[in-house]
Amino acid sequence: MTSEPGVAPGDSFFAGRNQVDDWRKVLLYDAAAEAGVLAALPASPAVMAHRLGLDQRAVRILLDALAVWDVVVAGQDGSYGPGPAMPGDDDEAVLRHHGRAIRNWSRVIDDRLRGAPVAPPAPQPGPGRAQWLDALAVFARRWAPTLADACLARFPDATSALDLGGGHGEYALELVRRGLRVTMQDRLEVTVLAQVDGRMADAGVEVFAGDFFGQLPDRAFDLVLLANVAHTYDATHNIELYRRILPLIAVGGGLAITAFVRDRDPRSAIFALQMLSGTGGGDAHTEHDYARWLHEAGFSTCAAMDLDGQPQSLVLARP
């Protein structure tokens, strides 16, 4: 998709200041994709409106606007087709995730400022949950090698790992490529989606379905990875989770936490809005917060480091 100067489409949601995709393009693209308009290309607005049960005038106006960014092109016969800037699968996943964030922020941040609690999340339909996982997987594929390098530099003798809250499975797959035996745990509805394409089974990743506040594997691991999970919880839940993880760490092993840490990268302060809008206590917690919580949970050492090119930081801890 055509981007503003300095903007990479795949960075739109986690971009720095003044580097984000045009909000108009993001919302228009997401609306067109959600309504099935893009999947119906090539066709005329009249044909698409009839086929999809949409308003013909609205379809035409939306397509004309998308043509400004070369997402679609108009033909001489009044039909529209995919344009040179039509995004590929990865960019589409990121743009749609970004679009949902814009709508969510505009709807709920005002409520949060006035102290209204976060409403319990409605059950996310299969397609919506899959789109969310797809967007997270785009970033994870980009960041996983750097994360694995850092974890194995700190725990070089690790031969087994638990990817806790592993979702899309990209980190688990990268650790398998490094020669580790890996178990990935997440909620049942997430693990079902993570296994659809068969990559987890082909790689030999063991999948453990369950809420990690209720059930964890009954054996120890050299490395426990908690990637992009801790910032979704408040202090109480973080401490409880670390206490539950502590017995799972084998002698000589440790815990690796990736999170948006507020005092280490300015993008984390922006990401905290996502936590404000969608969680009851999530935040871009500080490095001091993590050190204090880990110590209270029984860990003896804790150190934070930046990951090259990533907005998240890595917090490493040993029992």
Please identify what each model-predicted range represents.
Residues G298-P319:
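Core SAM-dependent methyltransferase catalytic element
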Residues M1-D111, A116-V118:
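N-terminal accessory segments
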Residues T258-A297, C302-A303:
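C-terminal alpha-helical "lid/dimerization" subdomain adjacent to the S-adenosyl-L-methionine
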Residues G99-A256, V261-R262, Q312:
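Conserved adenosyl
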Residues L27, L133-R141, T279-A284:
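Short acidic-aromatic active-site loops that bind/stabilize oxyanions
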Residues R24, M48-H50, D134, A158-T159, ...:
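Short, contiguous strand/loop micro-motifs
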